[in-house]
Amino acid sequence: SWNCPLYVGDSPTGPFTEMGPFISMDGTPFVPCDPCLFTDDDGRIYMYAFRGVDIPGREGEFISTVVGYELDRTNPVRVVNGPVTVIRQNTHANWWERQGGYNQDEEFGWVEGPHLLKHNGRYYIIYASPDTCTPNYCMAVYYSDEGPLTGFVCQKKNPLTYRIEGLVKGAGHGCVEHGPGNTLWAFYTIPARSTHEYERRIGMDLVDVDENGELFCPSGVTFTPQYIPSADTKKGAGENSTHELPVNTRYIPTASSFVAGREPHFSSDESPLTWWQPCDDDTEPTLTFGLKQGTYRVTASRVWWKEQGLDYAAGIVPGPFRYIIEGYNGKEWYTLLDRSDLDTDLNIDYCDFDAGICKAVRIRIVGWPKGITPGIVDFTVFGRRYVEGAE
């Protein structure tokens, strides 16, 4: 994202052809960092990007800003106005912009990854802070009622997406988009950082607008099953949860095998940096969770796979993991979900299924990509406590 030229295609799915670098008003070519394009209702095109501004007398130090440009509609690599500073790092006032895992640096923080949303005539810039690699990475909002390049003020309901604990955290560098039924949805990245420092996954959550026109996530950054945008399900104002909860998180399972340092409890510790890994000679790796004193009505599952041994250069590439999830009702094991014939590569595989009454659950891995040792970063089943005779 540091060097982003413009590409053009006849279809949203491509193919795309590079148009080259952008051309500033003085004719100098440049490539923006974290650019976002926006077309206003009148057809005028704008671009927003990160820009560092050097601090005089302090070598190597700079202030983070977001700048905006108006582009030539007939040749959109050419700037006709800008750069105009629309957001400037303000770490003394905005605690979420302060660098560090505990927002401890009051003098610096990244203000990056801008995205422009226009909703009900108001311009919103969604941006990310303070650092891609920390769990407090988040998105916040400035808005303007004047226009796409002027008058932006920091909204009071910041940050927009913020969660620092659990598997789903560091919800930054994303956007807010319109969805079905005039709804709004935040899309954000989640740091994984297992294979690469900037490795990420993508999450999404419902966004609402308060009485002052400020954006907020009514359920926050969620980690439990939610209704999809097109779900025809009656929900309350700002309500999007199915109300199913994790029933095995932080419980310690038993495993058919494991290698030293990759014990089975790593499959439920809510960390993207750890995983359970079975032994190489385990032909059907199995994890089994007892649900302690409880009996649960289990309705959904999520598996986050670890592709140990992945090596594109050597021809070891991703592929489908095949598995079966079973429940134990106190008398016998039975199938909750059968993915033994899965042909789709899903690094994170979420499924819902017919409810099963369970005192224990297990996952049996029955197939995996050639050359890869299967591992599980997270195995979670979702449900509610079951009481016989109660709804």
Task: Give each language-model segment a name.
Residues 269-337, 347-391:
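Aromatic, loop-rich ligand-recognition surfaces of beta-strand-rich domains
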Residues 64-80, 87, 231-269:
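Predominantly extracellular/luminal regions of secreted and cell-surface proteins
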Residues 168-169, 173-186:
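Active-site/pore-lining binding-face segments in mid-to-C-terminal subdomains
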Residues 33-36, 112-115, 172-175:
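Beta-propeller and closely related beta-sheet repeat lectin domains
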Residues 51, 129, 188-191, 305, ...:
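Short beta-strand segments enriched in hydrophobic/aromatic residues
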Residues 1-33, 40-106, 118-166, 181-183, ...:
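Beta-rich carbohydrate-recognition and catalytic domains
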Residues 222-245, 282-290:
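Surface beta-strand/loop "capping" patches
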Residues 340-343:
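Short beta-strand segments within Ig-like beta-sandwich modules, predominantly Fibronectin type-III
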